[in-house]
UniProtKB/Swiss-Prot annotation:
The chain crosses the membrane at residues 186-206. It comes from Pongo abelii (Sumatran orangutan). Pfam families: EMP24_GP25L. It is a single-pass type I membrane protein. Its main location: endoplasmic reticulum. This is Transmembrane emp24 domain-containing protein 10. Cargo receptor involved in protein vesicular trafficking and quality control in the endoplasmic reticulum (ER) and Golgi. The p24 protein family is a group of transmembrane proteins that bind coat protein complex I/COPI and coat protein complex II/COPII involved in vesicular trafficking between the membranes. Acts at the lumenal side for incorporation of secretory cargo molecules into transport vesicles and involved in vesicle coat formation at the cytoplasmic side.
Amino acid sequence: MSGLSGPPTRRGPFPLALLLLFLLGPSLVLAISFHLPINSRKCLREEIHKDLLVTGAYEISDQSGGAGGLRSHLKITDSAGHILYSKEDATKGKFAFTTEDYDMFEVCFESKGTGRIPDQLVILDMKHGVEAKNYEEIAKVEKLKPLEVELRRLEDLSESIVNDFAYMEKREEEMRDTNESTNTRVLYFSIFSMFCLIGLATWQVFYLRRFFKAKKLIE
């Protein structure tokens, strides 16, 4: 005997969006705080994909009360040393830039001053990709409904996942090509080494034969 059941419940895009956010969240957002001692430099590095918007907000608390001429410097560079953002006497602000290539980016905070000054507290909140987009502003400009905004966000998340998988597949192909090239080189080197050993053994046989003949130990 079967029980009664109601009409099937339609699931909207929100659970899937939450799942995608859970999967991508750790890689799209960098929120961290740390203490920066006087006359020290601390850097954070992160790999970011190509053509992605990167936004960030920072705040550096000054507990010195203006003593010791304490100054803080923020600089963001890529692996080639190109400066993407730089701020002298940084205390609080925001930054934004778009990546041109897949690269390792470095965010550095530097503190300079004199005397005995308490450590500065640095708070950094950096986002890239989907998380860096201001969907509230997009909704206002394009006059989107809340559901349409969530669908747009879901579409961007899906595209980001596809791009991540495509990049991983490309990296896998590159690593496979590298392994095949390495194996081929090892094979050629092994063959070359074998011929060298055979040649050396042959030379030793003829050399010893001539030596023993010279000593009249063999005919």
